[in-house]
Regions:
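Alpha-helical transmembrane segments within multi-pass membrane transporters and channels
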Residues: 9-53, 60, 192-197, 228
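Hydrophobic core segments of alpha-helical transmembrane domains in multi-pass membrane transport
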Residues: 1-2, 20-26, 53-61, 97-106, ...
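Membrane-interface helix caps of multi-pass small-molecule transporters
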Residues: 3, 7, 28, 32-37, ...
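Residues that define the loop-to-transmembrane-helix transition and helix capping
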Residues: 13-14, 45, 126, 136-137, ...
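Transmembrane alpha-helical segments in multi-pass inner-membrane proteins
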Residues: 9-21, 143-150, 154-219
């Protein structure tokens, strides 16, 4: 997104769309070259491979653009006053975009045949294959959707933060916390887990100190796992 806006001079929304296409294609390539050969390996191998890809891509980005902090100019710099609540337009765009994408993904998985095949394969890959589902095609589609959504999320998030190669580390850690809190295999749980983390960080930063804002997610993780180790909305997926 930074490259397409700063170097190519594309419009903000065009840059996000281009980033979504590129990251989706890159995700499919990673699935074919890395994760597909590991489909029968122990689950830990996938995690190690994902970390390796992350470090490799960060190194490539740093080689071309350096490790300096950069900014993406937001086309929405207005400050909105909604019922006495002051809110930057870009942050409102992030909120609306997040709920819109979550709703679209939920409808896609629940109301379309393709979405149903993705859910079926997530629950039982071998069983899905036995009933005629093309597991390879569904896997590539799943990676493409995940990559595109990640690119759109990053494009919405980048204008309110500094952009640098390792900017995703903290986001990934919080995503891990959200998945654990919500329960593996539960999309509604992931949504509610994200809201819990978001509100907790906002309230903690306001009443305590913004210095400790990023620690709150991990404190919540320890507390909730101590009470309910399977997460709040687990679907029984192991």
């Amino acid at each position: 997104c930074y490259f397409t806006m700063s170097d190519l001079g594309l419009n903000y929304w065009v840059a996000i769309a281009a980033a979504a296409v590129v990251v989706a294609a890159l995700s499919v390539i990673c699935e074919r070259l890395v994760f597909h050969p590991l489909r029968h390996a122990p689950p830990i191998h996938d995690k190690i491979a994902a970390i390796g890809i992350l470090l490799f891509l960060e190194a490539v980005v740093q080689m071309y653009w350096g490790a300096d902090f950069r900014r993406i100019a937001s086309p929405y710099n207005q400050i909105l006053d909604i019922g006495g609540l002051t809110l930057p337009a870009q942050r409102l765009l992030i909120i609306v975009g997040a709920f819109s994408l979550m709703g679209a993904l939920h409808l896609y998985l629940k109301k379309t045949m393709t979405g149903a095949t993705i859910v079926a394969m997530a629950q039982n890959r071998e069983g899905a294959f036995l009933v005629g589902i093309d597991a390879n095609r569904v896997a590539m589609m799943t990676f493409a959707i995940a990559g595109a959504l990640a690119a759109v999320a990053a494009g919405l998030f980048a204008p309110i933060n500094l952009v640098y190669p390792a900017m995703g580390h903290l986001v990934l850690l919080k995503a891990f916390v959200i998945i654990i809190l919500g329960g593996m295999g539960s999309i509604p749980g992931a949504i509610i887990g994200g809201l819990i983390i978001g509100f907790s960080e906002a309230l903690g930063g306001f009443y305590l100190s913004s210095t400790y804002k990023d620690v709150i997610a991990f404190v919540l993780l320890v507390v909730i796992l101590s009470i309910k180790p399977t997460g709040l909305f687990t679907k029984g997926v192991r």
